[in-house]
Amino acid sequence: MRRKNFMGPAALGMAVSLSLGMPATALAVTPEFGRSAEEWETLRDNVLEYGEIEDLVYEYNVTVRNNSQELNKFDNRTGRRESKTHSDAVGEYLRAANDAWSAYENAQDGATAAQSLVAAKQNEKAAEDQVLEGDRNAQLLQYKQTEKGIAKQAQAAMNTYFQLQYQLSSLEKNRDFLAASVTSAQGRQSQGMATYADVLNAQQALQNGEAQIIAMKSQIEDTRQNLIVMLGWKQGDMPEIRPIPAVDMGKIAAMNVETDTSKAIAADYTLQLDQKSFDNSNSEANREIYRKKVENDKQEIAIAVNDGYQKVLQAKNGYDEAVLNVEVETKNWNAANIKYQLGSISRIEYLQAETNLVKAQMDKEVKNLELFQAIETYDWIVKGVR
């Protein structure tokens, strides 16, 4: 995905001299040296491929970039320190501070008092830093959850974009059939075989079909714009959008609800955040609240994994049915083609069979994408994003 005007700080000066009038409109989160030249080339080639979406979200999504900047500001304000288990460390430092204050109050000489005062303040500062570090860890988890949620949303949007394209093809084929139906109705009316009302009905059906196409094209463009903006392009940009990869049927066979539920519980962002809140609670009442939240999270995760698996199976059945329907409509079209060549059916009957075949083919492609999306949704649940 190339952005000639998206580059890291290291390349900015040279780019200005080479591309006057093309200011950088967005910078990647990662410094230029953080990826290889080949990786940057892939992300900046003005081509959107499905496998690039997570990296594009990380580097160029506005929300993710803003969150990264906020985290950097937090680190600059507080300084980032690696910590022990948060609640244990805070407790240790506070106990040490209390002991130091007691020693200060009971000191028999000035030197001991001074040392105790320094120790008390140092431990209080360390406890405060631990609280800040706990806040940072929670903030980092929240930001990562947001980032992955946007990536999931972008993947689904790309899938929808192609589903709509197939649906548009089906509508356009149907529009052609409806146009032929109008011509047929007019011809039959001139022969006294159809009424004026029949012609009007055919014309109305054609108008409705054309309106559906206009609405579908608008929906496709809205989806396209939303997709590319999520990934750092502007609405008016026209990157090439490559097809979504083929469904890996082996993934379905490899799914194990019990094992995957354990993985999902370990990875779930909401559960991790609630667990942190439980660990850091300073009252029994709060601990009880978050204990219930943690248990509820685990139950919801188990339900989500099972539901996700069932939706994969349903999508697979839907795809299999669509494949069979294509076979049926192909046979029907072959038969209609022979009959049409022999003159035993009308052109409109032949076009109806042809239209049914195209609709079946497009429906199969849509069902294929629905299956792909069901598998991806399941995978996201296992990776901690519900």
Language-model features: where?
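Amphipathic alpha-helical coiled-coil scaffold segments and their short linker/junction regions
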Residues: 47-50, 54-64, 108-134, 234-295, ...
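Charged, solvent-exposed structural "stalk/scaffold" segments
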Residues: 67, 74, 128, 166-215, ...
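Coiled-coil heptad-register positions
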Residues: 75, 82, 89, 96, ...
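Short flexible linkers and secondary-structure junctions
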Residues: 28-156
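Short, solvent-exposed, mixed-charge loop/turn linkers that connect secondary-structure elements
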Residues: 217-259, 375-386
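Acidic, low-complexity, intrinsically disordered peripheral segments
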Residues: 30-50, 242, 294, 301, ...
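Sec-dependent N-terminal signal peptides of Gram-positive bacterial secreted proteins and lipoproteins
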Residues: 1-27
